[in-house]
């Protein structure tokens, strides 16, 4: 098979591992810089050009799109879809999962366990917003933040009011969530591929830190997840429409709660912690499921 990996840096661990795994399985792997792709939209002949050449003959595309280029990146994935190339994750699913608020709204509607979450626009509603999530301590998150950036733990009500008001004053959209103290600064990253959890790790926050992101000094270790946690991760990925997802779960007194569903989960932490060939399993999923893509848009035949 001829497989494209959309990545801005071919030296990144995840990109290198996918190339290695694909080539080991006998596939032709191409790392393509997302931002160097440009598109031609002509009746019945959508094209992607890359560094002066037309991209042709690809069977599948693996999107590794950073949050800062979501709009352009999903447009490129969508163009591959229009060309009939199988996307590991569809463009609409990537867009859906990147919108934190939309993700939680969809998961909430389907009954997936979540931390109590509030969202408001007016500073006048801050007091009730805090009450909504059972008061302080609480977590304040920028909707555009990634890797733990833009996440604040407010220990007191007064601190929460000040931080939320400051964000609102800067026209920064934030959501407020209950603080799951019993999680002890740890979360579980479940790596879902093709409707199955193929690997899971526990991420523990560094001392004095409540964010467990590995980019913020957290540590990772192998963990045995419960059947309920496994089912929750699979369901969350399915609701987002993602074939490949990193589902972040906290253990709370009222069962597993989903914090985030990541459409471009990194491989280094999970492979190191679990000693599993996650990249190889992702390639096997492509071998099994890749087929000419047909758009799902109503009224469209192709």
UniProtKB/Swiss-Prot annotation:
Residues engaged in binding ATP: 141, 178-179, 187, 211-213
Keyword Chaperone in record: no
Binding residue positions for Mn(2+) 2: 260, 262
PROSITE patterns tied to this protein: ATP_GRASP
Annotated residues for binding of Mn(2+) 1: 248, 260
Residues covered by the ATP-grasp domain: 104-287
GO biological process, alphabetically ordered: protein modification process; SOS response; translation
Cofactor remark: Binds 2 magnesium or manganese ions per subunit.
GO molecular function: ATP binding; metal ion binding; ribosomal S6-glutamic acid ligase activity
Pfam families: RimK (PF08443), Rimk_N (PF18030)
GO CC terms in record: cytoplasm
UniProt keywords, alphabetically: ATP-binding, Ligase, Magnesium, Manganese, Metal-binding, Nucleotide-binding, Protein biosynthesis
Domain of life from the UniProt record: Bacteria
Essential cofactor(s): Mg(2+); Mn(2+)
Intrachain disulfide bonds: none
Residues that coordinate or bind Mg(2+) 1: 248, 260
EC number: 6.3.2.-
InterPro entries noted in UniProt: ATP-grasp (IPR011761), ATP-grasp_RimK-type (IPR013651), ATP_grasp_subdomain_1 (IPR013815), RimK (IPR023533), Rimk_N (IPR041107), Rp_bS6_RimK/Lys_biosynth_LsyX (IPR004666)
Binding site for Mg(2+) 2: 260, 262
Family membership: Belongs to the RimK family.
Family matches, as HAMAP family: RimK
Name of the molecule in the record: Probable alpha-L-glutamate ligase
Taxonomic source organism: Alcanivorax borkumensis (strain ATCC 700651 / DSM 11573 / NCIMB 13689 / SK2)
